[in-house]
């Protein structure tokens, strides 16, 4: 996120019975011409010659038609919106919440997203995005040792550079937020079980659960294994969902090996297609 390879994070889900999912995966493997028993990922189905397979999978005769959902995250906007929510919203921010929904900070994030690169140049702006993403990361030993110092040094330098008025206003506001950044980072260092602020998976899963919650009050999720999905974070999400929607319940998030779970493989296909289209 931020300095990553893909500007879009896609999180897909399908609502389908296990047996039907297995049959569909086997059908797709036959159409692809898969050999052996290895798992086939979305790049295999995205090759140009397999376009008819993709069109069928997304079409009205497919078993997942009307039973698939994709949550797309623009990773650059995610970083900017989360950064400003934490530093300028005036209240505590939970890692499971989708950034960019705060009416106070959203216009600021949009201003940076739309105009800052033109003001500061691509290389400098990419560096700022990377520093922003690293500001609240605490679980990667390859990160710089002084992320707060490096971020605010960049902010100070940008404050001395001419930029669009709305961009300059946001950068000016950031100059006084260092105590908030230090306190937030310290809190996450002291409690590694807190949901990471710059991890898009948790908000995407949260929104996925809310989407399917419109169809059923009690949800059970089967998800591929991810280190970010700890029992504590899943419990935090379940509590938040129950509090925000009376009667709605996230009963289970079961982590599985995607090689042995056709429903997860189908979701991977759908996510890959959506990411390519985005």
Region annotations inferred by a language model:
Residues 2-278:
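Phosphate-ester processing/binding pockets and catalytic centers
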């Amino acid at each position: 996120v931020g300095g990553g390879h893909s500007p879009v994070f896609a999180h897909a889900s399908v609502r389908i019975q296990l047996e039907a999912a297995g049959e569909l995966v086997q059908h797709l493997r036959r159409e692809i011409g898969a050999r052996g028993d290895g798992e086939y990922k979305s790049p295999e189905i995205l090759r140009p010659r397999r376009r008819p397979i993709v069109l069928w999978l997304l079409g009205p005769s497919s078993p997942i038609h009307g039973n698939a959902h994709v949550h797309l995250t623009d990773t650059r906007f995610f970083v900017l919106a989360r950064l400003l929510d934490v530093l300028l919203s005036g209240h505590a921010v939970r890692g499971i919440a989708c950034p960019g929904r705060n009416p106070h900070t959203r216009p600021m994030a949009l201003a940076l997203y739309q105009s800052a690169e033109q003001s500061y140049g691509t290389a400098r702006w990419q560096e700022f995005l990377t520093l922003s993403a690293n500001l609240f990361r605490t679980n990667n030993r390859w990160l710089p040792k002084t992320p707060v110092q490096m971020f605010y040094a960049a902010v100070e330098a940008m404050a001395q550079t001419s930029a669009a008025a709305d961009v300059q206003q946001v950068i000016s506001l950031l100059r006084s937020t260092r105590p908030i950044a230090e306190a937030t980072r310290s809190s996450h260092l002291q409690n590694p079980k807190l949901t990471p602020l710059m991890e898009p998976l948790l908000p995407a899963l949260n929104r996925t659960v809310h989407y399917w919650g419109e169809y059923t009050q009690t949800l059970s999720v089967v998800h591929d294994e991810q280190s970010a999905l700890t029992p504590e974070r899943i419990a935090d999400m379940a509590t938040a969902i129950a509090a925000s929607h009376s009667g709605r319940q996230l009963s289970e998030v079961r982590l599985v090996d995607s090689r042995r779970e056709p429903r997860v493989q189908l979701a991977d296909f759908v996510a890959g297609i959506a990411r390519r289209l985005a």
